């Protein structure tokens, strides 16, 4: 659906790339970089190969030492903790807000030690975390902030003084992903890093290209993480429509909300409207835990796609158990992981489709939860 509407523009730009033979670091990459800088109102954008690399490169640019501690959320996609461990750093994970599922800022300060260097908050499902509070904590403790903005590109954060700023441009560094399902998605993998620091931008531009600033002279330990010209061309077309795409997601979310407003046992996404414009990368419901799996089965039988984001917190994932996280530190995550279920959310959803999904949900009985399992 989305491709059909912009097919002629996308095909034209792809043909230009093929004709130019500039498949790596072609002029279109710089053009997209400039346009994204203008859209975000940020000084520097560094395109890269994917969102995971973006996080890793951001950490590499900060001259951290093995064993330095990085504070982040317990509830997100694996990339956030993965890159910390890959670089020999220590993840210190924090429980989440039960309403938004974002990192709970009130729990951060108690986790800070003399080894803490960075906070990585995630703007989950399209909604900004309480980044202003996190920046204050970071400034107070001389820490740096990397915003994981893979799921909220185009969202604006509203400060207490009513000023607005794009998520991903507020901390020292921001990162994003252009995975196809993202709000701004390419037709493969892609990512980008944002910063207002000239020094950090210079360093990261070297890191993404094997540590080179001049060909075959390697000044940094780097990686091979360049956004290819084909993906840049596609993203450059779609960037013009990002606000429209996000508006479409918001309208679909509103229709879902209306459909579920009289269903007591279904909690629609909580929106912190005083600080954020939710752009709904996911539309995630919260339901009684004993009902969630039967609801998922019901949707599956009726050929309605759904997602469980996420079935486990980082502290329970097999790959990270060597970090010896304590289960008792994550009461909210332990509860939420059994309650969340995400419904179809994309730019081409129709009223008819949303009504069908909502009507299908209404056909299954939601039993009264026990006292211990109440939301």
Residue ranges of predicted features:
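Active-site PLP attachment segment
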Residues: 169-205, 212, 232
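Hydrophobic/aromatic ligand-binding patch that stacks against planar heteroaromatic rings
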Residues: 82-84, 137, 166, 183, ...
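PLP-dependent aminotransferase-like
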Residues: 60-156
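PLP-dependent aminotransferase class I/II
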Residues: 12, 29-34, 39-43, 106, ...
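Conserved active-site segment immediately N-terminal to the catalytic lysine
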Residues: 147-185, 214-219
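Positively charged, low-complexity/disordered segments
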Residues: 368-371, 375
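Phosphate-binding glycine-rich loop
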Residues: 21-69, 83-87, 93-95
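N-terminal "arm"/small-domain region of PLP-dependent enzymes with the aminotransferase-like
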Residues: 1-22, 27, 302, 344
